[in-house]
Amino acid sequence: DIYEIHKNKYDHNILLNDIQKLDKIQHKHSLVAIQFPDTSAEKKYLVYYDERWDCKLFLNYKTVDRADEESVINKVSADLNVDKSQINCRYISSKVQEKYSESHQENRIYNHRLYEIKIQVFPEDEQKENFVVNGRHYYWMSISDMERDPNIVKKNLDVIDFVKESMHA
């Protein structure tokens, strides 16, 4: 009845505000899978050591709502000192995952967008098993290498599984 409608002040504006708050809870990150240029061996991916997580992780960046692929290319180019014209980026998949954030010490909901990056000409120094660029330590690791690393398994197995399912389908 009319009395009940006026008593309950929850309307479409409040609903929209609640939806926007929920959206902010989600942490949007673009994951980057870069395969080692040598295709004869087991597939290896580029990971880096993240000090906040104390773990080797896939390259990742906060997702940009518009022009995310361009943003990913720009960031990979800057991080690895590779000319942007040498980088091809392809969207693979998305997945919403709840996981514990080592850096924030709490469970968080992540919306991961996975991109495959191909670099046409990889700098020779960056083809070594591990290397440092711009102060960041990088490693080439296969999925099975990652699955054998207890620290990666403990902190990031859900992301490893997501990449494995998406890239090896």
Predicted features by range, described:
Residues 1, 18, 51-65, 124-169:
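Nudix hydrolase/Nudix homology domain
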Residues 2-6:
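Alpha-helical transmembrane segments
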Residues 8-47, 64:
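Conserved N-terminal beta-strand and adjoining loop/helix that marks the start
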Residues 35, 114-120, 140-142:
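Short, well-ordered beta-strand micro-motif
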Residues 39-83:
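Conserved Nudix-box catalytic region and its N-terminal flanking loop in Nudix hydrolases
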Residues 83-96:
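A short coil-to-beta-strand element that immediately follows conserved catalytic motifs
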Residues 87-88, 101, 141:
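Polybasic, proline/glycine-rich intrinsically disordered low-complexity segments
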Residues 96-129:
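Active-site-adjacent beta-strand/loop module that shapes the phosphate/pyrophosphate-binding cleft
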